[in-house]
């Protein structure tokens, strides 16, 4: 069975993306397509700013920080992703970019979609 991670890309307290992500997850859970959907809220992972000396591509999915390791395990368990992200200053929010940059191999070869 494939697993799709629905990633809420904003960490703001009243982020609209959380409402959208929860709605999408509810709709997806009702589908009979043989796909498992899991909601991954960046705010709950509380990922620290990337400052490690070992770049993620060389970390072999083993991270010193337990929060980054938990994030790695959650992302690695997924076969694809739907990113729910706002646009801040013509880009994604900093916490979303940081969360993406903290990992490397976990993303490789997996399809993505954006909302």
Which sequence ranges carry the predicted segments?
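N-terminal beta1-alpha1-beta2 submodule of the flavodoxin-like/Rossmannoid cofactor-binding fold
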Residues: 1-85, 90-98, 102
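Short, acidic/small-residue loops that bind anionic groups at enzyme active sites
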Residues: 102-115
């Amino acid at each position: 069975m494939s697993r799709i991670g629905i990633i809420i890309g904003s960490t703001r307290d009243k982020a609209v993306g959380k409402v959208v992500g929860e709605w999408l997850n509810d709709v997806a859970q009702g589908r009979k397509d043989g796909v498992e959907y899991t909601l991954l809220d960046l705010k709950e992972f509380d990922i620290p700013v990337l400052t490690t000396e070992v770049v993620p591509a060389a970390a072999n999915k083993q991270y010193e920080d337990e929060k980054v390791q938990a994030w790695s395990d959650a992302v690695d368990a997924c076969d694809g992703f739907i990113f729910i992200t706002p646009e801040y200053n013509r880009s994604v929010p900093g916490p979303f970019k940081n969360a993406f940059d903290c990992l490397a191999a976990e993303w490789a070869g997996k399809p993505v979609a954006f909302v």
